[in-house]
């Protein structure tokens, strides 16, 4: 599993356990009449969230066209998951990020946040292939199909993954290294 998951340093350290729920891009944007958490009870559950936002390559996207809106940021998604009561957050790369980098890669620990915040929830990163297996083993569509549907409809396609439970623990230790100038 070490090759499939990595902790993200913007979340807090700690153990988590709960049912798994896919919540699309993990966005709550009342100003756009869009909410991936609408009608979803994620309290005490582990949420899977796509990076970025719907139609990120479309200049006419309601989410600030091709520029990332406030809803695209790691910290916004993590805070939103915590505000909805999630036990943990699992990020997964969106298709555009994979296409631009040429591969689905886990970020280096410092690449997706740098401050441990004990007020938040444990946050991890997972490979698309692993998330895809989870979604399909729960009888759902592929991650690609879900992402395409959300982008097409500009509407959530969130659902609980029946019979799927996740547990784990994140423990990140920050250290400072003195530098001589």
Feature locations, PLM:
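Proteins synthesized as precursors that undergo proteolytic processing into mature forms
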Residues: 60-68
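Well-ordered alpha-helical segments embedded in enzymatic catalytic cores
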Residues: 76-77, 180
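Noncatalytic luminal/extracellular "stalk/propeptide" segments of secretory-pathway proteins
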Residues: 1-60, 158-160, 165, 171, ...
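Long, well-ordered, tryptophan-enriched scaffold segments
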Residues: 83-100, 108-180
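Active-site glycine-rich loop that binds ribose-phosphate moieties when present
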Residues: 30, 69-75
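Mature extracellular/periplasmic domains of secretome proteins
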Residues: 11, 36-42, 78-87, 104-114
């Amino acid at each position: 599993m070490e090759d499939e998951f990595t902790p993200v340093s913007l979340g807090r350290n700690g153990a988590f356990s709960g049912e798994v729920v896919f919540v699309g891009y993990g966005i709550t944007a009342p100003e756009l009449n869009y909410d991936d958490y609408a009608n979803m009870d994620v309290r005490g559950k582990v949420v899977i969230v796509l990076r970025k936002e719907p139609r990120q390559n479309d200049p006419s996207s309601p989410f600030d066209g091709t520029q990332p809106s406030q809803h695209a940021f790691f910290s916004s998604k993590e805070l939103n998951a915590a505000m909805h009561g999630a036990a943990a957050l699992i990020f997964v790369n969106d298709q555009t990020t994979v296409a631009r980098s040429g591969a689905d890669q886990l970020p280096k620990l410092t690449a997706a946040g740098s401050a441990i915040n004990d007020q938040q929830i444990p946050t991890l990163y997972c490979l698309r292939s692993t998330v895809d297996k989870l979604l399909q083993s729960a009888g759902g569509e592929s991650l690609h199909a879900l992402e395409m549907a959300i982008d097409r409809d500009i509407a959530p396609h969130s659902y609980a993954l029946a019979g799927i439970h996740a547990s784990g623990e994140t423990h990140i230790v920050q250290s400072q290294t003195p530098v001589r100038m």
